[in-house]
UniProtKB/Swiss-Prot annotation:
<keyword id="KW-0131">Cell cycle</keyword>
<feature type="region of interest" description="Disordered">
    <location>
        <begin position="1"/>
        <end position="20"/>
    </location>
</feature>
<comment type="function">
    <text>May be involved in MAP kinase activation, epithelial sodium channel (ENaC) down-regulation and cell cycling.</text>
</comment>
<feature type="compositionally biased region" description="Basic residues">
    <location>
        <begin position="118"/>
        <end position="131"/>
    </location>
</feature>
<dbReference type="Pfam" id="PF15063">
    <property type="entry name" value="TC1"/>
</dbReference>
<protein>
    <recommendedName>
        <fullName>Arginine vasopressin-induced protein 1</fullName>
    </recommendedName>
</protein>
<dbReference type="InterPro" id="IPR020282">
    <property type="entry name" value="Avpi1/C8orf4_dom"/>
</dbReference>
<feature type="region of interest" description="Disordered">
    <location>
        <begin position="75"/>
        <end position="144"/>
    </location>
</feature>
<dbReference type="InterPro" id="IPR039579">
    <property type="entry name" value="AVPI1"/>
</dbReference>
<dbReference type="GO" id="GO:0043410">
    <property type="term" value="P:positive regulation of MAPK cascade"/>
</dbReference>
<feature type="compositionally biased region" description="Polar residues">
    <location>
        <begin position="105"/>
        <end position="116"/>
    </location>
</feature>
Length: 144
């Protein structure tokens, strides 16, 4: 029995030899050759209010490996999002204006709207408390 052709044959010409396809060697500090404006842009995109001052400090300390690590973490960070409406403003968005109607239907409508608000408050309370860790999860963290 002979050796299969796939083992004996040369790699296809479109595929480079493994030693050529190796990864580029990483620099000790990727920001060492960066310009001041590039570093400022990095801080500005991350939402930093003091981008110019921080960029100047980083640029002066470009040889320090701790600065490079901090900047890599900063680059991964996304800019801050707009804060959602607060609970008080969100509550106001559900308010409706009263329309003139019969007195009997108004009492029924008031009772049903109070039940709706109470059920929403209860579900919001459950959602808030759902993610709070209990004492068992705390003990689990201590044991391990």
């Amino acid at each position: 029995m002979g050796t299969p052709a796939s083992v004996v044959s040369e790699p296809p010409p479109w595929r480079a030899p493994p030693e050529v396809r190796g990864r580029k060697q990483a620099a000790a500090n990727i920001f060492q050759d960066a310009e001041l404006l590039q570093i400022q842009g990095l801080f500005q995109r991350s939402g930093d209010q003091l981008a110019e001052e921080r960029a100047q400090i980083v640029w002066e300390c470009a040889g320090d490996h701790r600065v490079a690590e901090a900047l890599k973490r900063l680059r991964r960070k996304r800019p801050p999002r707009q804060k959602p409406l607060g609970p008080s403003v969100h509550h106001c968005s559900r308010l409706r204006t009263a329309e003139p109607c019969a007195p009997q239907s108004r009492a029924t409508e008031t009772a049903s709207s109070e039940q709706h608000v109470n059920s929403r408050r209860a579900s919001a309370r459950i959602r808030r408390n759902w993610r709070k860790p209990g004492p068992t999860s705390y003990l689990h963290q201590i044991r391990h």
